[in-house]
Amino acid sequence: PMSHPTNTVVVSAPPLPGFTTTLFVQADPDEYAVVAPLMDVSGVGVVYTQNSTSRPWHHAAGPAQATLRRSADRNVLLDAGQYAGKNRRMAQVGIDESWVRFQQRDLGLPWAMADSGYCARGDLPGVETILRSCGKTSGNVIAPLPVSKYLLIEDADKVRDLIEKQDRPVALIVEDGADPFGARGVAAGLVHLLAGGAPIGLLRADTSALGALAFGAPFAAIGTRPGLRHIPMKG
């Protein structure tokens, strides 16, 4: 879990416009029946996650629509999950704008999340591709950055510069075999990104999500199971 570095100012940010919470649960679409009552009681949001690169969009659409019907709050995000698995997409491929439009027009979500591919160690061009592609979309769009933990350890300055050159909120998703924030330098890298003031959330996390919120993230999500608390290593 992410610990607070010493001598830092802890600030919390308001939710993104259209949301009423900063804390989300990251869940499989099949977990709707478990997650929905939790949302009713606690007011948290949900990130429905497609964990197969072969599953069609509508797999998560049903639970998303059911959640929107159930609650006056619209704290729902869809994570396409294209960055994970044996056949995962890489960042340089770009994004599918029809997936963005599907979330906006068909589902009426307050925020659409692009279906970004994975950014490997040192893949700053991949980060740039995702941010540039998301910048060309219209409406409320979050740019997911699914990254190797080494991009936070080794290239936090450069990643922060790229994020601050564009105007989309960013959702950071970090790869590791277990807990990425257990590795030296990862938490410091995230805090460095958040210190820039750009809206950066953390998805697929454990209690590190609470640390991210304390340091100014406008949204963060805790996974319902270990595989949804980080990007599993490929294999």
Predicted regions and their residues:
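Glycine- and other small-residue-rich loops at beta-strand/loop junctions that grip anionic moieties
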Residues: 175, 179, 201-202
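Short catalytic-loop micro-motif centered on adjacent basic/acidic residues
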Residues: 23-25, 199-202
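Glycine-rich phosphate-binding active-site loops on the catalytic face of alpha/beta enzymes
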Residues: 43-54, 111-112, 203-234
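Extended alpha-helical scaffolds
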Residues: 180-181, 207
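N-terminal active-site wall of soluble small-molecule enzyme domains
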Residues: 182-190
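Glycine-enriched alpha-helix->loop->beta-strand junction motifs that scaffold or abut catalytic
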Residues: 40-44, 108-109, 166-170, 189, ...
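Active-site beta->alpha loop and helix N-cap motifs at the rims of alpha/beta catalytic domains
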Residues: 2-176
